[in-house]
């Protein structure tokens, strides 16, 4: 073919393809050979590629991503989105106003886009030949800039397809529960004795145990509760059972908190079993992709080694609608000869784990597949999940270290005495590639203090609230000694939420306890069963959460605000487990609609696109199939809430589009979001929705001050009705904006027409003319009426004045809002430029407010302003967005989403003297720094290539504004637009800018 410069080059067009050598490729890919193959085909044809370039230095595409990830393994998008950044070079500072005008993408063997005239460098859809399951694709891109220069080709990147069709799977679903053997046959309990080990007391419990036999199976956790009483309080006891099973006599025993099962080979749903398969290889494979599809939790092992750092995977889904699979490159783990593939399973949110896995390899020229079936073997690991994973009882783990087998996944270990797994029917749901980031250990935290409590137990303090687990090294413990660990987020009163682990010692000179398949929210660990205090250096906690890519940074002259920023980040990390943001990690662990209040805070700090895309799907999956009403929690539940909680599905959809410019999420969810709106409308009479459902189905603003769970002084019913009516109007406008994105203009117009009809009806139903407010003289109700257009135009100044009086006078600079009210208050005041009011609110140090929490020693945000109940909660995590979008002023533009056009509108408020902030947008790093000295302001702004910006420079007059030492109006690439609310507004292209101005006397 001939390219646009008249240069001839060869290009491969066969199904097979060539891999470019890329030394910078991610570690999982460095081992792959130059000649690649499809794992669906045994033969390979290789073609040569020659791409001569005569490029002009200046721009270069870098940071190539496919489906928002670098070199992803196992994607399932048939037309994946490809993205890149534009890097400038050759001059310092970098040139201004750099834009891409065209691009060309080459995907080896399957697609040459040709030169495409477009400035799009994000979410470019693949347009080549149909993609093949298991195939690796190599791609590169070059771009043309607005000076007519063509770049060098980018360094190559890759993506690897996952399973695209159900028929790609040959692996069978397996379970470690004994299937047909679950009916044990004829089991008779001959004698059962519950006795103290020291002989202090003995009880005959034969009758009790006999009643616990179900379908020929006895499967219990030994304890006084299930056995009818405690014959020897505070003494260690055993249950000894003699039985007859199918005519054969036997005996068994187990201690308190241990599991006793007859038949002995039976594994329960609460077990965390080992599952394995051995196989032989004649040579090390040139490629080996493992695809693991588990409902529950798992860890993957090959030849005794854990594969990768991921934990507690996969992410949780609605198991009635879909499951997730993950893909691994196993070449570094395999060897010639005998190999062993192992899965360590646990139930997670399921009653018991089920799994399927297949490993596709190329050994020499021969394809080979290992897949789960009934020939795989399993046994107990000695780990059992404690607790029912229910409200206020998420439990923990029982670890019997005497059963620990560190060589369970070693190929030389015999599994002849292991039990066979059971093949089970395949769930009638699709399996999809996991797109959200995996969970990992994010930080190790040493214990800072150990004290002996009045009850004789030992208390470890880690100095901060966290979500994770304890690592405790034990020395000189007798075999069978049981250590119990409780976890608390508050000491006065002690608040554990039934979180506990039990560890039965193996009796080794040194051993270590650490959870694997459950976690806790805590600051303190209380240890029972130790004769002497633990050594402080032997105790660590590990923070666990989603391994988000960091996308932002903020610091300023106020140490109080810097602390708030760090606490906000830490709180979000403490809530980021299992593919959704939970309300709290200990009491409920549910994906409540609370998560919508932290959307902007999360997106400014982290890469959230795949995470929120997945979570928005969970809301759609959970919608009522008859009405379309979205649940209050997703993907797990149920939980209490109201129309606003189900609205989280739409909020996630819209913000994901606004921040990342991907229309696919809107296409997927728009109709489901409309059904949710329509479901709310079924409860309307005369244009006003009235309370429906029970107490926990129509909540308005959750836990404002003095209206929390400790007082039961909930807002009156009309307040919840007004709040939810306003929220339903908010959903309508947001939905109309999404419909416009897809070109559904008529539907958007119809939605707004109905919105305009409803606004005066809601006003008439709730406005008190005499008192001049809606329902209550509280900030949430002024705010919601203003934000949603319920207030008639002629009343807006008066209602805004009442809101300001409520903040400044009635509440003396404090807020009186709850979770949703706080979120909307911050967004609304920032939108209308009242950052002075936000500064007043945020910098308060007494109750209620974030400063009050800090003064009381909070290391994560609480559920209620006064600290009642949960100490790690999502309610007030909306704060951080103001630091980025208010103080630094970095905001997306709805007209050009994904930060294709940037708004920089900083707030110079209070006694703040400087701000340093950046956000790594899809197009590159945006920087907004400012410093004031008296009334002199210096702003430094960086806008990434291929974008434009509107920059608001706080200034007394535009004529006094300079840029890089010149009058701003004369500076290259700077265009004055207008004066607006005490700021000179400029249009700029990419590049670095330094503005200086004289601040107005009054600034907001």
Where do the PLM segments sit?
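Bacterial N-terminal signal peptides
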Residues: 42-53
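Extracellular/oxidizing-compartment recognition motifs
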Residues: 59-185, 268-586, 594, 610-611, ...
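Extracellular, modular beta-sheet/disulfide-rich ectodomains of secreted and cell-surface proteins
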Residues: 183-268
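Alpha-helical support elements that line or immediately flank enzyme active sites
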Residues: 288-297, 302, 469-487, 517, ...
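Active-site acid/base region of carbohydrate-active enzymes
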Residues: 297, 356, 363, 367, ...
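Non-catalytic C-terminal accessory modules of carbohydrate-active enzymes
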Residues: 358, 375-377, 381-407, 432-443, ...
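C-terminal capping/lid segments that line or modulate ligand- or cofactor-binding pockets
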Residues: 395-402, 587, 605, 649-650, ...
């Amino acid at each position: 073919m001939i390219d646009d410069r008249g240069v001839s080059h060869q290009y491969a067009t066969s199904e097979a393809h060539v891999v470019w050598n890329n030394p910078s490729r991610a570690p999982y890919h460095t081992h792959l050979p130059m000649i690649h193959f499809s794992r669906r085909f045994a033969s390979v044809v290789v073609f040569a590629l020659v791409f001569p370039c005569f490029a002009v230095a200046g721009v270069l595409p870098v940071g190539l991503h496919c489906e928002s990830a670098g070199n992803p393994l196992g994607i399932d998008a048939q037309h994946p989105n490809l993205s890149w950044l534009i890097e400038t070079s050759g001059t310092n500072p970098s040139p201004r106003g750099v834009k891409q005008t065209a691009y060309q993408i080459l995907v080896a063997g399957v697609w040459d886009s040709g030169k495409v005239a477009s400035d799009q460098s994000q979410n470019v859809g693949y347009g080549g030949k149909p993609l093949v399951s298991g195939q690796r694709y190599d791609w590169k891109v070059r771009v043309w800039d607005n000076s007519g220069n063509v770049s060098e080709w980018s360094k190559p990147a890759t993506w690897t397809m996952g399973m695209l069709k159900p028929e790609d799977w040959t692996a069978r679903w397996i379970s470690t529960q004994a299937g047909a053997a679950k009916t044990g046959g004829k089991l008779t309990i001959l004698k059962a004795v519950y006795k103290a080990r020291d002989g202090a007391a003995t009880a005959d419990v034969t009758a009790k145990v006999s009643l616990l036999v179900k379908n020929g199976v006895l499967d219990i956790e030994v304890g006084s509760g299930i056995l009818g009483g405690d014959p020897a309080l505070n003494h260690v006891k055993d249950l000894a059972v003699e039985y007859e099973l199918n005519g054969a006599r036997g005996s068994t025993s187990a201690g308190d908190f241990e599991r006793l099962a007859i038949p002995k080979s039976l594994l329960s749903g609460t077990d965390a079993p080992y599952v394995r398969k051995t196989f032989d290889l004649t040579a090390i494979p040139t490629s080996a992709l493992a695809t693991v599809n588990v409902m529950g939790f798992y860890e993957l092992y090959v030849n005794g080694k854990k594969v990768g750092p991921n934990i507690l995977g996969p992410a949780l889904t609605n198991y009635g609608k879909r499951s997730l699979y993950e893909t691994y490159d196993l070449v570094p783990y395999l060897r010639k000869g005998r190999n062993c593939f192992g899965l360590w399973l646990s139930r997670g949110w399921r009653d018991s784990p089920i799994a399927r896995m297949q490993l596709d390899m190329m050994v020499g020229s021969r394809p080979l597949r290992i897949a789960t079936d009934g020939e795989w073997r399993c046994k107990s690991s000695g780990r059992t999940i404690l607790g029912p994973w229910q409200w206020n009882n998420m439990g923990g783990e029982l670890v019997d270290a005497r059963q620990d087998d560190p060589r369970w996944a070693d190929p030389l270990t015999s599994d002849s005495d292991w039990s066979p797994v059971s093949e089970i029917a395949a769930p009638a749901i699709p399996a999809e590639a996991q797109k959200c980031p995996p969970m990992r250990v994010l930080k190790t935290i040493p214990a800072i203090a150990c004290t002996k409590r009045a009850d004789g137990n030992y208390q470890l303090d880690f100095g901060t609230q966290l979500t994770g687990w304890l690592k405790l090294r034990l020395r000189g413990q007798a075999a069978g000694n049981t250590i119990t660990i409780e976890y608390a987020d508050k000491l006065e009163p002690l608040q554990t939420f039934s979180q506990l682990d039990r560890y039965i010692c193996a009796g080794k000179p040194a051993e270590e306890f650490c959870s694997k398949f459950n976690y806790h929210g805590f600051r303190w660990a209380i240890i029972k069963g130790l004769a002497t205090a633990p050594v402080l250096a032997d105790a660590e906690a590990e923070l666990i959460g989603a391994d988000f890519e960091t996308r932002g940074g903020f610091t300023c002259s106020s140490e109080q605000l810097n602390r708030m920023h760090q606490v906000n980040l830490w709180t979000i990390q403490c809530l980021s487990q299992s593919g959704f943001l939970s309300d709290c990690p200990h009491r409920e662990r549910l994906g409540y609609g609370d998560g919508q209040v932290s959307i902007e805070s999360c997106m400014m700090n982290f890469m959230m696109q795949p995470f929120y895309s997945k979570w928005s799907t969970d809301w759609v999956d959970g919608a009522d199939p008859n009405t379309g009403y979205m649940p209050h929690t997703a993907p797990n539940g149920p939980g209490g809430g109201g129309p606003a909680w189900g609205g989280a599905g739409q909020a996630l959809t819209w913000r994901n589009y606004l921040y990342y410019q991907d229309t696919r999420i809107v296409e997927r969810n728009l109709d489901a979001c409309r059904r949710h709106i329509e479901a709310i409308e079924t409860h309307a009479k005369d244009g006003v929705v009235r309370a429906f459902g029970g107490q926990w189905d129509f909540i308005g603003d959750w836990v404002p001050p003095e209206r929390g769970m400790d007082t039961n002084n909930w807002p009156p019913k009309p307040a919840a009705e007004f709040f939810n009516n306003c929220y339903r109007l908010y959903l309508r406008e947001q939905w109309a904006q999404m419909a416009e994105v897809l070109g559904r203009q008529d539907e958007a117009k119809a939605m707004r027409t109905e919105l305009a009809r409803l606004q005066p009806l809601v006003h008439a139903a709730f406005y008190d003319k005499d008192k001049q407010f809606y329902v209550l003289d509280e900030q949430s109700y002024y705010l919601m009426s203003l934000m949603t257009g319920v207030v008639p135009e002629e009343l807006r100044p008066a209602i805004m004045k009442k809101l300001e009086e409520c903040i400044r006078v009635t509440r003396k600079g404090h807020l009186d809002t709850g979770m949703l009210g706080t979120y909307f208050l911050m967004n609304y005041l920032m939108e209308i430029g009242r950052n002075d009011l936000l500064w007043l609110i945020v910098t308060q140090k007494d109750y209620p407010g974030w400063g009050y929490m800090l003064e009381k020693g909070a290391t994560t945000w609480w559920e209620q302003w006064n600290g009642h109940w949960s100490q790690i909660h999502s309610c007030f995590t909306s704060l951080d967005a103001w630091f980025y979008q208010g103080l630094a002023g970095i905001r997306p533009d709805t007209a050009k989403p994904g930060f294709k056009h940037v708004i920089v509108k900083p707030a110079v408020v209070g006694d703040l003297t400087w701000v340093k902030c950046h956000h790594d947008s899809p197009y590159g790093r945006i920087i907004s720094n400012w410093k004031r000295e008296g009334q002199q302001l210096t702003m430094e702004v960086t806008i990434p290539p291929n974008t434009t910006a509107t920059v608001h420079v706080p200034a007394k007059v535009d004529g006094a504004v300079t840029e890089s030492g010149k009058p701003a109006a004369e500076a290259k690439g700077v265009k004055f637009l207008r004066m607006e609310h005490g700021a000179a507004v400029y249009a700029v292209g990419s590049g670095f800018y330094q503005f200086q101005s004289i601040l107005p006397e009054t600034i907001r």
